[in-house]
């Protein structure tokens, strides 16, 4: 096998169009991201049809910019990695069809990547010496998982949400208290001005035999609190509501992830996904894990949000195992982690 394996990666599962060139799964030569946040902000959330159209408008330019920044041509690329699920089906299809076209035209192998696996693999970019096994908390707008990474590309899901994802709950609560979209960063910011002990919102605790999450109850409790305040004509302290809600979500995420670590006897927790940028989650996880002698690994913001570099990393580890994907592959919007 060549000393350097160059992956061109494409990500378009939601509202970011991204392309990257990644070498040997850990070195990023380029990572171009065209965000649609300003487009969807006025709608209060991502509009799938609008997202798909925006991907179509920019994907060619984004891929070319990724190659140019890396000073590569397609001849220098060994394989093309692309997200094929989970995500918005129309958005996924834009990136997938573009990648399939490149693979067909160049004869390069196509490697379909699970978006969640990509988030986990972002840690290999930031932490060059990281090797399995380790625990990973994946928290984003659409997904919440506790994953035990046994080996490269081998996962065991120990806990997942039974309803709303953590990031989804953040967005809905932010909308309810008038903060707008995207909710996660706005709740994080205003919470710094609030008292996290001001309001006691519930924590979803299941039986001891599961590490699953439920955030719909917390979300409903916040909405009920707001409705009661409004009906009584009482003033609502948005900062206190945001801080108290945030703490209730973070406490459950941290507690379950530490329990998972203890059950598998691992001493490393990697964090992935957009909600990993939340300052309360970072601080609480580091503080509580320190008490247990567990190391916490958190990538920088650019690798927490949706990006193609993480897809390139995951694709590399598939490539060296000799795995590639048929050009008949289709988008799988509800793809499960570990499915092929």
UniProtKB/Swiss-Prot annotation:
Domain of life: Bacteria
Keyword match Transferase: yes
UniProt keyword rRNA processing, yes or no: no
UniProt catalytic activity: L-threonylcarbamoyladenylate + adenosine(37) in tRNA = N(6)-L-threonylcarbamoyladenosine(37) in tRNA + AMP + H(+)
Primary site of residence: cytoplasm
Binding site for Fe cation: 115, 119, 306
Major enzyme class: transferase
Annotated cofactor note: Binds 1 Fe(2+) ion per subunit.
Residues annotated to bind substrate: 138-142, 171, 184, 188, 278
Cellular location(s): Cytoplasm
Function noted in UniProt: Required for the formation of a threonylcarbamoyl group on adenosine at position 37 (t(6)A37) in tRNAs that read codons beginning with adenine. Is involved in the transfer of the threonylcarbamoyl moiety of threonylcarbamoyl-AMP (TC-AMP) to the N6 group of A37, together with TsaE and TsaB. TsaD likely plays a direct catalytic role in this reaction.
NCBIfam families in alphabetical order: gcp_kae1 (TIGR00329), T6A_TsaD_YgjD (TIGR03723)
PANTHER family attached to this UniProt entry: TRNA N6-ADENOSINE THREONYLCARBAMOYLTRANSFERASE, TRNA N6-ADENOSINE THREONYLCARBAMOYLTRANSFERASE, MITOCHONDRIAL
Protein name as catalogued: tRNA N6-adenosine threonylcarbamoyltransferase
